[in-house]
Amino acid sequence: MSAPRLEIDLEAIADNTRTLVSQLDPLGIGVTGITKASLGSPGVAAAMLKGGATGLGDSRVENLARLRAGGVTTTTTTLIRSPMVSQAALVVRDADISLNTEAAVIDSLAAAALSQGTTHGVVVMVELGDLREGVPVADVVDVCRHVVKTPGVVLTGLGTNLACQSGVAPDQLKMDELSQLVEKVETSCDRGLSIVSGGNSANLDWALSTADAGHINDLRLGEAILLGTEPLHRRVLDGLRTDAFTLFAEVIEVKTKPALPWGDTAQAAFGTPPARHDGELVRQAIVALGRQDTDPHGLAPPSGIITLGMSSDHLVLDVGDHDVSVGDELSFSLGYGALLRAATSPFVTKLEVDSA
């Protein structure tokens, strides 16, 4: 088989979705499955829907278009990054809903929707402290009123995002504040909100321990479904599988070399050279895998093998006395950043399998 290769176990993704849906359902919280770390794979999307996700979301409109082209047409799709004005027509065509913070963008979406003879759903995002996207709390009602009075768009809900930019953790106080804003908006705009999206996989620590979810009825889950982990502490969540993704790469050199480089040293290809530990000799393997293919942070080699460094196209490993030869394939588990880059690299073959 071709390498490097990302193997995707679709049943593991369905299992994780099913587990999270069953855990969140008693709280009245549905799951929007986020496909961006799979490059909008229709197969991954179908697995999420099989597991009970109530909708799908992605940060790139191109990925949402890929879902539709791949036959995923029977569920609500949400663009989870604030739309670009230049893509307003594409957003209206390929997404049912988008997360928004700017009146100018909302107006562009409205104009595009009217020209296409349709309407587009708007979820207004609220800034609750992580300092990425979001309308200041004091301005939320005014922005929502603007949506309500603008033909072509429909005020669908409120949402927030935490833990992505500044690491601010979702907690009961943050979620209560969002719920209180929902009541304020519903009263001021004289209409109910169908979606109150409390955040992403980082919300699961809160959601699975809270006694009161308030008005929160949606979470946008990617990492937890795909990797079985939560982003705050990279902890494996109870009942979730961590074997949905495996990256395979081929060994192209195995040689015993000195433990330390020699000669005058300066910057390496990506800045400061990686530290090398003193010693006499290292049995070193090079794998045909580089930063063009994945992120070295979050890339875990087989047990007992040590990563020495990675450049654009080469991964250097200390394989010790492991039985490793040229032409062999080694398997790697992935953290979120490593998965995201591997899934989006054109040099990594994707192979979806169904273990059911």
Regions found by a protein language model. Give the residues of each.
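Active-site anion/phosphate-binding pocket segments in diverse small-molecule metabolic enzymes
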Residues: 176-356
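Active-site-proximal beta-alpha core segment in soluble small-molecule metabolic enzymes
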Residues: 5-7, 29-176, 180, 188
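Short aromatic-glycine motifs in intrinsically disordered, low-complexity regions
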Residues: 1-3, 141-149, 232-242
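A short, Lys/Arg-enriched amphipathic alpha-helix followed by its capping loop at the start of a domain
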Residues: 23-29
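Generic N-terminal amphipathic, Lys/Arg-enriched alpha-helix
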Residues: 1-8, 12
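N-terminal capping/small domains of soluble enzymes
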Residues: 16-17, 26, 37-49, 63, ...
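A non-catalytic, amphipathic alpha-helix used as a structural packing/dimerization or gating element
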Residues: 11-19, 177-180
